[in-house]
From Swiss-Prot:
This is Protein MEN-8. Keywords: Disulfide bond, Secreted, Signal. It comes from Silene latifolia. It comes from the Eukaryota. SUPFAM superfamilies: Bifunctional inhibitor/lipid-transfer protein/seed storage 2S albumin (SSF47699). It is found in: Secreted. GO terms for cellular component: extracellular region. Its main location: secreted. Belongs to the A9/FIL1 family. It holds the Pfam family Tryp_alpha_amyl. Disulfide bonds join C38-C76, C48-C65, C66-C91, C78-C98. Residues 1-33 form the signal peptide.
Amino acid sequence: MANNMKSATFCKATWAIFLVALAILVQLKGSEAQAGGCASQLGNLNVCAPYVVPGAVNTNPSQECCAALSGVNHDCMCNTLRVASQLPSSCNLAALNCGN
């Protein structure tokens, strides 16, 4: 049971770090991205980084983080997660299995 919790926590943390890194990358490359609006929305999520790092002392997001998150279009977030979930197989890596 403890290993499952550690695995799930690690997987969630990995995804969170990946999404924050992706958001920063998208912000840097935003002008090159085809979906500029989505890229800009994701880029604003960098203010949420302190709350998604494993072992973070404060896991309660700031108002700034919540505002940035509320500014991300539902389809933008879902499409980003879908594309991100396909990256491991595109790199010939095992698919992520994060559990619940």
